[in-house]
């Protein structure tokens, strides 16, 4: 019932000290949650070439600021995040991971650009000649559910018959693990 939970990220103690939660971060996150709830769309661009369009109609928006005071809630520290869970099929465009960005999966800074093409929530292409793009492609290919063409592109379309529809349904569920689940951004001044 009244339990409050705080998940502490596996960060260096210096980062935790630098990213202490405060009332100002809480107010900023709550303001941005309201903005996300009131928006119909979000566009993300960058000098590196990112041009991502996210439909927000019907999206669930939330966030966290690194501490919790209400019973029955969970947060994580460091905090300071506003995010949205958009409807299926509403994320499209190009996302470029540029040198200096962090790839949390590999716990490393990106050294050479990776360009991801996203269509209806799915990464349909991973471009880049450097080690970072190679690591991303091999990581996704290692799961063995994208076929010889590389990463899973989109749920397969049934070709007819109940067996084909059942196989497509199973394949679609498996590939949904690769779809965009949420989009968000940080608001913690100490992280800048």
Where do the model's predicted regions map?
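Dual-mode signal for accessory low-complexity, basic/Gly-rich regions
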Residues: 109, 125-192
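Active-site bordering "gate/hinge" segments
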Residues: 1-119, 134, 144, 149-163
């Amino acid at each position: 019932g009244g339990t409050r939970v705080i998940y502490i990220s596996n960060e260096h103690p210096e980062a935790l000290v630098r990213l202490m939660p405060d009332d100002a971060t809480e107010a900023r996150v709550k303001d941005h949650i309201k903005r996300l709830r009131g928006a119909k769309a979000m566009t993300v661009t960058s000098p590196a070439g990112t041009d991502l369009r996210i439909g927000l109609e019907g999206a669930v928006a939330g966030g966290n600021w690194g501490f919790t005071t209400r019973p029955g809630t969970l947060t994580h520290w460091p905090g300071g995040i506003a995010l949205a869970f958009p409807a299926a099929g509403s994320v499209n465009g190009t996302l470029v991971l540029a040198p200096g960005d962090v790839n949390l999966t590999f716990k490393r800074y990106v050294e050479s650009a990776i360009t991801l093409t996203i269509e209806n929530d799915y990464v349909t292409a991973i471009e880049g000649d450097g080690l970072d793009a190679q690591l991303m492609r091999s990581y996704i290919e290692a799961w063995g559910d994208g076929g010889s063409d590389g990463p899973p592109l989109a749920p397969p379309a049934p070709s007819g018959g109940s067996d084909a529809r059942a196989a497509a349904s199973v394949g679609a569920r498996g590939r949904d693990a690769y779809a965009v689940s949420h989009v968000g951004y940080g608001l913690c001044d100490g992280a800048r």
